[in-house]
Amino acid sequence: METKNILTIGIDYRVVRGGVAAVENVYSTFYQPFNHVATVVDYGTMQKMMVFFKAYIQFWKWMLFHKEIEIVHVHGSSDASFWRKRIFINLAKMFGKKVVFHCHGSEFQRFSAQHRNAVQKTLIKCDCIIALSESWKCWFETTIHHKNVVVIKNVIALPRVKKVKHNNFVLLFLGRLGKRKGIYDLLDVLIKHKTTFEGKVKFLFGGDGDVEQVKEIIKQNGLENIAEFQGWVNGEKKEYLLNLADAFILPSYNEGLPISVLEAMSYSLPVISTTVGGIPEILKNGENGFIMEPGDKDAIYHAVVSLMEDKSLCKDMGKKSF
C-alpha cells in the first residue's frame, strides 16, 4: 500500500518490547514507504531523553522539507506516552496536517479531572481517533465528545504453528508482571490450590515489570514445581512457548485489545481473561475460553480446572479461537 503521504509517530518498534511495538512492526510491512519517527525506547532515562529530542528534530524536518506528508498517524497510549504524543499532535495541526490518533492505552478513565480536560483539548483537535474496541469507541464519544471515532482491532502476523508435545497441562501468561495484568490474582490462586495443581499443571510466566516480587512469591510459597518464570520472551522463544501451551491466561484489570490474547488465539489456544476493554468482543465465555470479572479468583480457578481436566473441551475451545 503506497503511503508516502503518511508520517507515523510511535515507538522504536525494532527494539521496544510489548504490544504497541508488535502492531507497528506489522504496519511497517505493508506501509510503503513506512515513514516513521520513534519518540521513545524502553531503556535508560538518558537514552529516552535523547531519543525524544532526536524525534522532535526529525519531526520538524518532516514538516518543513516533506510537503508530500498530509496525514500524521500517531500511535499513543495513556500516562507518559500521551503527554509525549501531545506535542506532536499540536505541531502537526500547526502545520495544517490531518492527525489520526491511534489509541493503545487502557487507563485514560483514571486521569484526574484536570488531566482529562487536557486530554480532551488535545484529542478534539485530531481528525480521527482509532479505538481498539467498541467499548473504547463509546468512551471517546461520550467522554471526549469526539465525532469521528472508528474501531480498528489490533493486527498480528500469522504464526508458524507446530505444537510441542508434553505431559502436564501448560498454562501460559505473557505480559507485564503487575497488578494491572492480574498476575497477583493468578499467584493467589496457585497458592490456595497448590495441592490441586501439583503434578498436573505447569504455569509459565513471561514478561517484565515486578519480576523480583513474582519470583519471591513463587519461592516463599514453594511453587517452583508448578510455576516457572521465563523472563521477557519474544521471537523464537515466544513462538516455542505458544506452541507448547495448552491454554493462555491474562486476568487483567485494564486493557485496550491485548496483542498477547490475539497471538494466543492465532495459535488456537483457549483463553482465560476478563471483561475489560475489547476482550469481550473477541472472547466468548464457554466458546473459545472463559471470561470473568477482574479479581474473581474463584472463577479463575474453575476455568483452569475445567480446561485441565477436559482435554476435549480445551481442544474444541482452541479451534474456535482461531
Tell where the protein language model's regions lie, with residue ranges:
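Short hydrophobic beta-strand element within catalytic cores of glycosyltransferases
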Residues: 270-273
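Conserved acidic donor-binding segment of nucleotide-sugar-dependent glycosyltransferases
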Residues: 285-286, 290-297, 306-311
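Glycosyltransferase donor-sugar binding loop
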Residues: 40-41, 174, 202-215, 231-232
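Nucleotide-activated donor-binding/catalytic signature segment of Leloir-type glycosyltransferases, i.e.
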Residues: 215-233
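A short, well-ordered alpha-helix in the C-terminal region of glycosyltransferases
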Residues: 299, 306, 313-322
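Donor nucleotide-sugar binding/catalytic pocket of nucleotide-sugar-dependent glycosyltransferases
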Residues: 124-160
